[in-house]
Amino acid sequence: LKQPTFCEYNGFQAYGDANGLQVNKEVDLKNQLTIQYVANHEKPSIAKTIRFEPAHAAMRSIVLEHALAEQALCGIHFSRAHPSHIFSFSTKIGYTPMVIFRDNDITQPNHMLEAIRTMDEKGMRLVDNFKKTFPDLYDTIDQVEFKSNINTSDITKIWSIAAVFIGLYEGDDALESCEKLESTAIEFSGKSGPRIDYKVISTEEGYQLDPRLAIRSAMSFKLAGLDDYLLSFGFIDSLADFIAQQTENADANIGIHGVTLSGGIFENRQLLMRAYNGLSVNYPIYRNKRLSIDDANVALGAITLGSE
C-alpha cells in the first residue's frame, strides 16, 4: 500500500503501508496519520474517512489469502451481528449486489405475525388457522419480546423468530433463540428438510430477501404436522439451496471462477457442509484459513479495497 491505512472493525484493528499488512486486537499506530476505513453501517469517529461494505472487505481478504486477483467471483457473506450480502465481483464490472439484507421493522415474533396477516388474504387465513390449531403457541408468539442481542443480521433474525414460531423458545434473548433452532436442527439425522421459502422481492434498493415468506412457509409446515427437528433443519438446508441458486445466477451473469464464503453464520457446520455439497460440484469454494471468517477478515480486507 502506498499510503498508511487503518481500519477498526468489531474489536479488530488492521494496518497497512509499504512494508506490509497486519491485523490484531490492537495495532500501535504511533500517532501517525493514516487513511481510515469505516463500515457503511458504523458512525465514523473522525470527519474524513472512506466508507466500505463489510462483505466486500471479507471477500477481499479471501482473495489475498488465496491469490485470486482478477478472478470473477460470487461472494456469500452471512454475518451473525452485522449486515449480510450476496454479490458478484469482476474486474470489469466491480462489485455488483445480487441480494441485499436490510434491517427492517420485523424484529419481534408478534411483528412477524402481523406482517404475515397483512400480506394478503392467504396470509390472513394462515394466521387465523394457526391460532385455532395452536392457541397456546399463538399466545406465546404474541407475548414473547426479544430484549437481549436484538441488533443482529437478517438471517439471525429469521432463525430467532422461527424458533419461537416452531415452539422451541419462549425467552427474551434473540441470539439464544437462534442458537436453539440451530441446536435442534443438528439433532435431525435425515438427508433433506422441507423447502423453507428464502425468496427475494424487488425493491427500490434492489433485490431483497423477504423474511415473511420464510416464516410463512414454516407455519404451513407446522400445520401439516412436521416435527420440530425436521422443520428446524429445513431452515438450514433451504438456505444452502438458496446459496447454490444465487451462485448459479452469478455464474450466468458474469461467468464466475469460484465462490467465497464468509461471516459468522458459516460457523454452523451443518450449513457449511450443505453449502459445500451444493456448490463444490461446479465451483471452487474459498474461505479464510489464516484469518477468522468474520471481523478480523473484514478489518484486513477493508484497508486493501480500491487496489483490486
Regions of interest found by a model, annotated:
Residues 1-308:
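Acidic, glycine-enriched active-site microenvironments
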